Amino acid sequence: MKKLLFLICFISTGVYAGGAYALYDYEQHEFQVSFNTYEVRPIASITKLFTAITILRSGAELTEKVKVQGKSGGHFPNGMMVTRHDLMKAMMVSSDNRAAETLAHTYPGGFNEFIRDANAYIRGRGLMNTSIEE
């Protein structure tokens, strides 16, 4: 019953409309059915979750103000000084892309270090076919 419920929930969230789905049996540790599971596609807002985790794991001071920067749209104008905490809220609640960009660019060690650390975390979770890129 759990498998069927999971599949129904998965389909009802619009994932099926995206052209891929999977039904995994956690007791047998195998997929019962799947479609297009290896097609490469953008992971959209899931990237923001990995961004938040990477920022929190870095120990970066969330009350520190950083300069907003980015090419994407967002709630904060470029050049504005905003705390990482407020950027995290905007990124997670409003799906603010510029907030995510700013957090990545103001990461301790810089943007390239953010990409390296985020991808190391992702690989450490066993997600070998998932990565964050610029």
Which residues fall in each region the model found?
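Active-site-adjacent loops and short helices of periplasmic peptidoglycan-processing enzymes
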Residues: 16-134
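A general lysine-centric signal
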Residues: 2-3, 48
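Sec-dependent N-terminal signal peptides
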Residues: 3-13
